[in-house]
C-alpha cells in the first residue's frame, strides 16, 4: 500500500531540439491523490482517491475496500513508514477487519512493488502529455489504474517481478 500524488502540470519525458519549442502547461495547482493497494499475484489494484489529503481516514477506507473485495484469505498489507499508516484508528480498523501490516525499512521504496506501478502510471499518463482541464487529467489516471491489470498485463508482469537485488558478503562501515 502506498500513496501517489499526481499534480496537474506538464511533465516532459525527453526533449532535445535545436529550435525553441513552446509547450502548453496547466496551472499545476490541483492534485489528484491515489492511495492504492496492489495484489502482487493478480496485479489487480484497489484504490481510494481524493483531491485533498491522504490521511488515516483514507487508509481506513482503503482497508474496508480490501476487506469487501472478498479475497477469502488473510490480508497482509506491505507499507512504508508513513505517519498516517501508524495511527491508533488505523490499527483498530485493521484488527476489526483481520488485516495485518508488514512495514518496510525506512528509505526503501525499491522494495515496494506499488512504487513501480506509480512510475509506470507517470510514464504512461503524464510524460509529454497535456491535459487542458483537471477532469481529463483525473480520468486518464483513473482509467489506466482501473484497467492496467487487463490491458497492460504483459508490461506490468515484467515490471512487477518479485526479483529483488541482493548483496552477498557486503562489509558495512560504521561511522
Which residues fall in each region the model found?
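RNase H-like two-metal-ion nuclease catalytic core shared by retroviral integrases
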Residues: 79-81, 88, 103-124, 135-137
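RNase H-like DDE/DDD metal-dependent nuclease/strand-transfer catalytic core used by mobile genetic elements
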Residues: 58-102
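Short, glycine/charged-enriched secondary-structure capping and boundary segments
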Residues: 13-16, 91-94, 116-117
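Short, function-defining helix-loop hinge/capping sites that tune catalysis or transport
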Residues: 10, 47, 88-89, 120
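C-terminal anion-handling pockets and recognition modules
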Residues: 115-175
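RNase H-like polynucleotidyl transferase catalytic core
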Residues: 21-27, 97-113, 130
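Pocket-edge positions in alpha/beta enzyme catalytic cores
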Residues: 51-55, 109, 129
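Extended, low-complexity cationic-aromatic segments
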Residues: 1-60, 64, 160-162, 167-175
